[in-house]
Amino acid sequence: LNHDILQSKSNTFLSAIHFNTSSKKKSEIGVSFLDVSTGEFLTSQGSSDYIDKLLQNFNPSEILFSKQKRKLFSETFGDNFHVFHLEDWVFQTDYATDTLNNHFKTNTLKGFGIEDISSGIIAAGAALHYLSETRHDKLQHIAKISRIAENEYVWMDRFTIGNLELYHSTSPNAVTLLDVIDKTISPMGGRLLKRWVALPLKNKDKIISRHEVVSYLLKNSKVLDNVKLNIKRIGDIERLISKVATGKVSPREVVQLKNSLEAILPIKEKAQKAKNESLKTIGEQLHNCKLLREKISVTLKEEAPVLIQKGNAISAGVSEELDELRSIAKGGKDYLNGMLKRETKRTGISSLKIASNNVFGYYIEVRNTHKDKVPEEWIRKQTLVNAERYITEELKEYESKILGAEEKIAALELDIFSKLVEWMLQFISQVQQNARLIGELDCLCSFASLAKESNYTRPLLDDTFEIDIKEGRHPVIEKQLPPDTPFIANDVYLDREMQQIIMITGPNMSGKSAILR
């Protein structure tokens, strides 16, 4: 979970592949995708063509498969992936099923809808096994596994994805479709939009439902602006709650999580009041996480540090013992300041300094020019090039008081924070649901903003075989034209009866491929 290497708007998927080489199902392959940073866990199975399309769409950072299947993997999917080989015994049905059931604390996988895809189960079990072997022992945020429904999406092969330049291009500095249409604000929205582009829906009702929300937001610009304003205040709560689960979250990140959850409240209110059923559903399903927000607010200071070891993270009033120790530490430091003033006056050494370091503790530093003024009872502790450092009985006494208090404060703050993080584990599913819903809402707001900015028109969808485009513009090419250069819009009509084929002619660079794309 190193956030320096994680791009906020991209998933970092680990994938596992299982080749079913039994006599009946030689062509069947299982696949799983797991993002430790977000908790997403997906599985499926099918032909090599289907699995190849999944790999192209999910673009995993690493793929696991059996050592014995190296040649088969290379022949089937090529050599352009970063791969890791596991022992063959990991890819057994019983072992994989037990691994998944033990992780999810279930007796069966029926509740996840994957019980009948044995190759997918084996691939999923291999991914979890690999994580357990690589010291990922805290995986409570991986709370469910979902089946990728093959018949719900339009599946594109690697050549189509490449030629359409949906979200990556082989050409340097090329602009992709995602670059043009991505108006998302949150990391969750950015990741989901990429998924939506990679996996276009086939279900007409689901597509129309998205269109209805976009239309509502376009007609109600105040709602759109208000929702976008509050989404801007929301951090990457999906990855933050994953860091809570893995125990790698900082005090500052916990406060960021609390502030993000507070920004969801006005969004929930607006969505619930909307005259659109999909938005209302989002509003109703968003959790207000009141108990979680209040606990964090009471326990941690708003300006909590990045590292708990820095101290001063826990609010006053949380622990009576902590408050008393802080009072002792502060009082001791005040005493040292008073001692400095007193000794400066007594010795006449104006440059006198009382300081401390990790090696020698507290000391009084005197420059060599004033060595003759040092009282006899001071004990030399360290000699420097231009100064001498001394200790006194009085300084020793207060050093032990201050350092003792500071050590206890550090231990107590760490204990309180650790208990808070452990207590927060019960809210993982609620925060994950909020992250998913905010991501969805962010994507829909992005579509509305894009439609408004680019003057896009809502398409009419039906079950006929007609394609009827009026004044169509290619979204990417249009944005790449020089300023004040209009895009020449084109009409396209195709159906099964009258016009099944059209012939496009013209010189080079006249826009033939733009029509095809």
Predicted feature residues:
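Charged catalytic and DNA/RNA-contacting regions of genome-maintenance
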Residues: 1-216, 225, 229-232, 236-245, ...
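ATPase nucleotide-binding head domains, primarily ABC-like/P-loop NTPase cores
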Residues: 117, 185-186, 190-196, 367-396, ...
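A structural-propensity feature for long, helix-poor, extended segments
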Residues: 214, 218-221, 399
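Charged, surface-exposed helical/loop "interaction arms" that form contiguous linear patches used
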Residues: 246, 250, 260-263, 281, ...
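Cytosolic, long alpha-helical scaffolding segments
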Residues: 267, 292, 299, 362-378
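Extended, charged coiled-coil "arm/hinge" scaffolds of SMC/Rad50-like chromosome-maintenance ATPases
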Residues: 384, 388-422
